[in-house]
Amino acid sequence: MPKMKSHRGACKRFKKTASGKVKRERMYGSHNLEKKNRKRTRRLHQSTLVDSTQEKQIKRMILA
């Protein structure tokens, strides 16, 4: 059986932490920032963890 290939788009978007959880960046934080207040843009630049309901599928895509 051939080797499994990882999903390259998912590998660019998600990283596995040392404890085994999956980290992601928030959306809506890259442009049109003048319409958003400072508190919101600061929060959008922080990374967060993937929800536990989707963690299994993403780990399978990035082969982690």
UniProtKB/Swiss-Prot annotation:
Q: Which keywords accompany this UniProt record?
A: Ribonucleoprotein, Ribosomal protein
Positions with biased composition (Basic and acidic residues): 25-35
Report the InterPro entries cross-referenced here.
Ribosomal_bL35, Ribosomal_bL35-like, Ribosomal_bL35_CS, Ribosomal_bL35_sf
GO BP: any one term: translation
For this protein, the record's Gene3D superfamilies field holds:
4.10.410.60
Q: Name one GO cellular component term.
A: cytosolic large ribosomal subunit
Looking at the record, which segments are called Disordered? 1-64
- Biased amino acid composition, Basic residues: 1-24, 36-45
Q: Name one GO molecular function term.
A: structural constituent of ribosome
| UniProt xrefs under Pfam families | Ribosomal_L35p (PF01632)
Similarity-based family: Belongs to the bacterial ribosomal protein bL35 family.
Fetch the HAMAP family from UniProt.
Answer: Ribosomal_bL35
Indicate what this protein is called per its UniProt record. Large ribosomal subunit protein bL35
Q: Could you tell me which species this protein originates from?
A: Prosthecochloris aestuarii (strain DSM 271 / SK 413)
Taxonomic placement: Bacteria, Pseudomonadati, Chlorobiota, Chlorobiia, Chlorobiales
Its gene is: rpmI
